[in-house]
C-alpha cells in the first residue's frame, strides 16, 4: 500500500519557537531563528526516519476562516504571534519552496481541514496516511487507513484508539462530541460550561454521541440536564467548530510526490547561520554518497598484525568510535595526533574533585564523526599501563598541539593531577558558546542539541546511581566518551565560523583564551587560610549570636528557635501581630521582610543583626575550614568564565568574591586569608574604572578633564550638583554624588534613587536633571546607546563583547525599562571586565617571562590579589602599575591603586 505523510507546519513551528524561547538561536543579523531551525530539524528527522514517497506540509489560511465568520470569538483569546516569529514562518515557506518540498494552503481554511480532506481522499485512493501532529482535533480523522503520530524524544508515538481512551475516556470516533462538550480554551470554543472532562466522558460512555445525549435528557441527572438545556446552542455551535472539513476540493495525491530535492535551500541555511542543517540536508536528505572505503588499519595505513580489531570499533550510520586497547594502537594514534591540526580531548573520572579524582579514560577526536577512547581502566581490566599512556601523551604535548575542549580547565587539572604534563587549550567550546550568546546555556548536551540537532548520551543512562565510570563496559564507555570528544570537535568547527561572522574571534583568541590560562593557574595556586584564627573568630561570632538571641527572646517574651522560619513566622505575625506590607510574600521571613517590619517592633533590629551574623558564621567561619584541600593546605576556589552576561568572572566552591568588605566583621574574615612562607599580599585595583569608561564612551569633556587632573570624581560631581566649592563638600554630599554617579551607570530611576538616599522623588529627579546638565554628553551617549541596542538587538563593549537584549523592544514598559538599564550597564561593566582581563593576562605573562615566584590568587571585580615574596615586592608593584594602566588606551588615563598587607583584611 502506498503511503502519504501529512504535516501540520504551524504546530511544529510554534513548538520549536517556545521550547527555546529563553535561549534563542540568532543568525548573524541578530535575528531569532529558533523556529526556522527547529522546523527543518524536525522535518529532516521525519524524512530520514520514514522516507516518505508522498508528503504534504499544510499551513493555515492567512485570511479569516469559515469558523471565524461563523463565530467571531473563535481564537479571539489567542495572543498575536511574537514579532520575532512572524518572519521565520516566511523563511520556512521560502525554504520549502527552494527545496521543492510540497506545501499546501487554501484560503479560508485551517491546516487541520486540509489534513482531514487529504486523509479522506488518500484513503479512497488506497493510501495509508500518517498525520504528524499532537493536535487532539485531528483524532477525529483516525481510521484503518489514517494514523495519527506525534514526535516525542526523537521517536514516533501513535495516538491510536487505546491512547485516546486512556487520555480522554472516550473512543476516537467520539472526539468531536467530547470537544463539543468540554470546549477548547486555546481556540476559545465555549463547550458546555459546568461539564468537565470527566462528566463529558461519562455522558458519552452512556449515550455515545452529542445527539444521543440530547435525545435522553429526561434520564440524565438534574445538574447535567439543566446545564445541557442552558448551553444547548453553545454545544452544537462547538460541535460545528471542532468538526473538520473533509470534502475540500484539493489536488490529486500523486502531485505531491517527494522527489528531486533541490540544493537551492542551502543558501538560505547559510544566510541564517544554520550550519548543522546544511550538513544534515546534504547527508540525510540529498542522500549523497558517503565515503565508505574499507580502512585497513586504524588510520588508513597498510594492514599490520596490530591494527584495531573490529570488536573494538563502534560503527553506526554516522559515527565511528573506537577503543584503543594496545600499545601499538596507542602509538599509531599518537603519531596521527601529531599530524592533526586540532585535537579535541575529554576525560572520564571517578569524581568531580580534580585533586582526588582518579582518571578512568581519555577520549580524543581530530575528525568529525570519529572518536577514540583510551581506557585507563574498564570493568577492572587494565589494557595499557597508565605510565605508558602518560609517557605517550606527554610526548604529544611537547609538540604543542592545538587542544580543543569543553570546559577544558577541568580536564587540564585532572590530567595534571594524574601525572600528565598537559598544555592549556587553544579553544574551549564552552567559552565560545558563551561569547556567541551570553544569555544561553553552555552545557555540552544543550549545545549539541542547539547547534547540531543531536541528543547526547546522558550520563545517568550510562552510570547507575552511586556507581563509577570504571565499572561500565568498554563498549559503553567508548560510545559515551568518544561522543563527547566528537561533539566538541564538531562544535569547534561551527563556533570558529560563527565567531568570525560575529566579529568575536579576536575577543576569543586574544582575551578569553589567554585569560583562561590565567584562571587555570589561579585555581591551582589557591590561597592560604589561617584555620586557628578563623576558628577563634567563629567562636566569637557564636557568643555574639547567643547574646543577641537572649535579648530577642527577652524582648518578645517567648523562647523559640530563631533559625526556624516556621516558628519565626508564628512569632512575628501571630504572636506580635505585625503587619506585612503589600507585595511581600506572606509566608516569608527573609531579610527583606524583616527590614520592612523594622519600625513595628524593637526586636526586629536584633533579628536582622542575628541573621546577618549567622550567615557570616555558617558561610565563612564554619564552612571555609571544611573546604581547605588536605593535599595543598590551601583553599581552591573555581572561577567561572561563562556565567555573567557582562563578562565578569565569578567564584564558586567557595565564593570568595562575596566576602563583605565594608563592615568590620567582613574585614575580620578577610584577615584569615594570609600569604605563606614570609610572603606578602599585594592588591591592585582600578580607580573608578566604570566612570572612566563612561567618560571615554560619552566623550564628555568635563568628566574627561576631571580624570586627567586626577580629581576625586564624586567630589567633583557633588561640587557641580550643589554648586559649591570642592573644599565645602561634606562626606554626606559626596555620598549623594557617588550614588548618582553609579546610579547613572545602572540607569537608576528617580524613585529608586530617592529610596536609596532617603529623599523625595522630586528631589531625586532634580539631582538627575542637574547631573545631565553638568555632563551633557553622558545623556546623549545613553540615548544613542539605547537606540543602537534597539536596532542591533545587542549591546557591545569596547572590545566587541555582545549581550543580546531582546526585551529592549518589548511593549511592556517594565520589561523595556529593565532592558534599557541592562543596555547601559552591559557596555560599561562589560568593558571594565574586558580591560581587567587584558591587564591580568599581561601581568601573568610578565611574571612568567621574568621567571618570578609571584602569583595571582584572586580577582574580585576590579581588584587583583597577588602573593609575592618580599624581595619581589617592588618589581611586582611596578609591573602592576604599568600593565594595568596600559592595558587599554582610553581618551583619559587609567589609574591603578596598589596596596600591600600581611592579610587580605589589612588591604582597603
UniProtKB/Swiss-Prot annotation:
Organism placement in taxonomy: Bacteria, Pseudomonadati, Spirochaetota, Spirochaetia, Spirochaetales
Name of the featured protein: DNA polymerase I
Gene that this polypeptide is encoded by: polA
MF (Gene Ontology): 3'-5' exonuclease activity; 5'-3' exonuclease activity; DNA binding; DNA-directed DNA polymerase activity
Limits of the 5'-3' exonuclease domain: 1-318
InterPro entries in UniProt: 3'-5'_exonuclease_dom (IPR002562), 5-3_exonucl_a-hlix_arch_N (IPR020046), 5-3_exonuclease (IPR002421), 5-3_exonuclease_C_sf (IPR036279), DNA-dir_DNA_pol_A_CS (IPR019760), DNA-dir_DNA_pol_A_palm_dom (IPR001098), DNA/RNA_pol_sf (IPR043502), DNA_polI_H3TH (IPR020045)
First-level EC class: transferase
Chain's role: In addition to polymerase activity, this DNA polymerase exhibits 3'-5' and 5'-3' exonuclease activity.
Record keyword Nuclease present: yes
Record family assignment: Belongs to the DNA polymerase type-A family.
Amino acid at each position: 500500500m502506498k503511503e502519504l505523510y501529512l504535516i501540520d507546519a504551524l504546530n511544529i513551528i510554534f513548538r520549536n519557537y517556545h521550547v527555546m524561547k529563553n535561549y534563542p538561536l540568532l543568525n548573524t543579523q541578530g535575528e531569532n531563528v529558533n523556529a526556522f531551525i527547529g522546523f527543518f530539524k524536525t522535518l529532516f528527522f521525519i524524512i530520514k526516519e520514514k522516507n516518505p514517497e508522498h508528503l504534504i506540509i499544510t499551513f493555515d489560511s492567512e485570511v479569516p476562516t469559515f469558523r471565524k465568520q461563523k463565530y467571531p470569538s473563535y481564537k479571539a483569546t489567542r495572543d498575536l504571534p511574537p514579532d520575532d516569529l512572524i518572519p521565520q514562518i516566511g523563511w520556512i515557506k521560502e525554504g520549502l519552496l527552494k527545496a521543492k518540498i510540497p506545501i499546501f494552503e487554501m484560503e479560508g481554511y485551517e491546516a487541520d481541514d486540509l489534513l482531514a480532506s487529504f486523509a479522506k481522499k488518500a484513503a479512497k485512493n488506497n493510501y495509508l496516511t500518517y498525520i504528524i501532529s499532537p493536535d487532539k482535533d485531528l483524532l477525529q480523522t483516525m481510521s484503518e487507513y489514517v494514523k495519527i503520530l506525534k514526535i516525542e524524544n526523537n521517536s514516533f508515538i501513535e495516538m491510536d484508539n487505546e491512547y485516546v481512551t486512556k487520555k480522554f475516556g472516550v473512543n476516537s470516533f467520539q472526539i468531536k462530541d467530547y470537544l463539543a462538550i468540554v470546549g477548547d480554551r486555546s481556540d476559545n470554543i465555549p463547550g458546555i460550561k459546568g461539564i468537565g472532562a470527566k462528566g463529558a466522558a461519562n455522558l458519552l460512555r452512556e449515550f455515545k454521541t452529542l445527539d444521543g445525549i440530547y435525545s435522553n435528557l429526561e434520564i440524565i441527572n438534574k445538574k447535567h440536564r439543566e446545564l445541557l438545556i442552558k448551553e444547548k446552542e453553545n454545544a452544537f455551535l462547538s460541535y460545528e467548530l471542532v468538526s473538520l472539513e473533509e470534502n475540500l476540493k484539493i489536488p490529486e495525491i500523486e502531485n505531491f510526490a517527494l522527489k528531486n530535492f533541490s540544493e537551492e535551500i542551502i543558501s538560505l541555511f547559510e544566510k541564517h547561520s544554520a550550519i548543522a542543517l546544511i550538513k544534515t540536508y546534504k547527508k540525510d536528505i540529498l542522500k549523497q554518497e558517503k565515503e565508505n572505503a574499507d580502512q585497513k588499519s586504524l588510520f588508513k595505513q597498510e594492514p599490520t598484525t596490530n591494527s584495531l580489531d573490529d570488536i573494538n570499533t563502534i560503527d553506526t550510520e554516522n559515527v565511528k568510535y573506537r577503543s584503543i586497547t594496545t600499545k601499538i594502537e596507542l602509538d599509531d594514534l599518537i603519531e596521527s595526533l601529531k599530524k592533526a591540526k586540532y585535537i579535541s580531548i575529554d576525560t572520564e573520572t571517578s569524581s568531580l574533585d580534580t585533586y582526588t579524582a582518579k582518571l578512568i579514560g581519555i577520549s580524543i577526536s581530530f575528525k568529525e564523526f570519529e572518536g577514540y577512547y583510551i581506557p585507563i581502566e574498564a570493568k577492572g581490566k587494565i589494557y595499557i599501563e597508565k605510565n605508558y599512556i602518560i609517557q605517550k601523551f606527554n610526548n604529544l604535548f611537547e609538540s604543542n598541539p592545538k587542544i580543543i575542549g569543553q570546559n577544558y580547565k577541568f580536564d587540564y587539572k585532572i590530567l595534571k593531577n594524574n601525572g600528565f604534563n598537559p598544555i592549556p587549550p587553544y579553544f574551549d567550546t564552552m567559552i565560545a558558546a558563551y561569547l556567541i550568546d551570553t544569555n544561553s546555556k553552555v552545557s555540552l548536551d544543550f549545545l549539541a542539541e542547539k547547534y547540531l540537532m543531536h541528543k547526547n548520551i546522558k550520563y545517568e543512562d550510562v552510570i547507575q546511581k552511586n556507581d563509577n565510570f570504571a565499572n561500565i563496559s568498554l563498549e559503553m564507555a567508548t560510545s559515551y566518551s568518544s561522543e563527547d570528544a566528537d561533539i566538541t570537535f564538531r562544535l569547534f568547527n561551527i563556533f570558529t565560523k560563527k565567531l568570525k561572522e560575529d566579529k568575536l574571534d579576536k575577543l576569543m583568541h586574544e582575551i578569553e583564551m589567554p585569560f583562561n590560562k590565567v584562571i587555570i593557574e589561579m585555581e591551582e595556586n589557591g590561597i592560604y587560610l589561617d584555620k586557628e584564627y578563623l576558628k577563634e573568630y567563629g567562636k566569637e561570632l557564636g557568643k555574639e549570636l547567643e547574646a543577641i538571641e537572649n535579648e530577642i527572646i527577652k524582648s518578645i517574651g517567648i523562647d523559640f528557635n530563631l533559625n526556624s522560619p516556621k516558628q519565626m513566622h508564628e512569632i512575628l505575625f501571630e504572636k506580635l501581630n505585625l503587619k506585612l506590607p503589600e507585595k511581600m510574600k506572606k509566608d516569608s521571613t527573609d531579610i527583606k521582610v524583616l527590614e520592612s517590619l523594622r519600625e513595628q517592633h524593637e526586636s526586629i533590629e536584633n533579628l536582622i543583626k542575628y541573621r546577618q551574623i549567622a550567615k557570616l558564621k555558617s558561610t565563612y567561619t564554619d564552612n571555609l575550614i571544611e573546604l581547605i584541600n588536605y593535599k595543598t593546605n590551601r583553599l581552591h576556589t573555581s572561577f567561572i568564565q561563562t556565567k555573567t552576561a557582562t563578562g565578569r568572572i565569578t567564584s564558586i566552591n567557595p565564593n570568595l568574591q562575596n566576602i563583605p568588605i565594608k563592615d568590620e566583621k567582613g574585614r575580620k574574615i578577610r584577615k584569615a586569608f594570609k600569604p605563606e612562607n614570609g610572603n606578602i599580599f599585594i592588591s591592585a585595583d582600578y580607580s573608578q574604572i566604570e566612570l572612566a569608561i563612561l567618560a571615554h564612551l560619552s566623550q564628555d569633556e568635563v568628566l574627561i578633564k576631571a580624570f586627567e587632573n586626577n580629581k576625586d570624581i564624586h567630589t567633583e560631581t557633588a561640587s557641580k550638583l550643589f554648586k559649591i566649592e570642592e573644599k565645602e563638600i561634606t562626606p554626606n554630599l559626596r555620598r549623594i554624588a557617588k550614588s548618582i554617579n553609579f546610579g547613572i551607570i545602572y540607569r537608576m530611576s528617580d524613585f529608586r534613587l530617592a529610596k536609596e538616599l532617603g529623599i523625595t522623588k522630586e528631589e531625586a529627579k532634580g539631582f538627575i536633571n542637574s547631573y545631565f546638565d553638568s555632563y551633557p554628553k553622558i545623556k546623549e551617549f545613553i540615548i544613542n546607546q539605547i537606540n543602537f541596542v534597539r536596532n542591533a538587538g545587542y549591546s557591545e563593549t569596547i572590545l566587541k563583547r555582545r549581550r543580546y537584549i531582546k526585551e529592549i523592544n518589548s511593549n511592556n514598559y517594565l520589561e523595556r525599562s529593565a532592558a534599557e538599564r541592562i543596555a547601559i550597564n552591559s557596555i560599561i561593566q562589560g568593558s571594565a571586565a574586558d580591560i581587567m582581563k587584558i591587564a591580568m593576562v599581561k601581568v601573568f605573562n610578565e611574571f612568567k617571562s621574568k621567571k618570578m615566584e609571584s602569583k595571582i590568587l584572586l580577582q574580585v571585580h576590579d581588584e587583583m590579589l597577588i602573593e609575592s615574596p618580599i624581595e619581589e615586592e617592588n618589581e611586582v608593584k611596578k609591573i602592576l602599575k604599568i600593565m594595568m594602566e596600559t592595558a587599554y588606551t582610553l581618551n583619559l588615563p587609567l589609574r591603578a591603586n596598589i596596596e600591600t598587607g600581611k592579610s587580605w583584611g589589612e588591604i582597603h
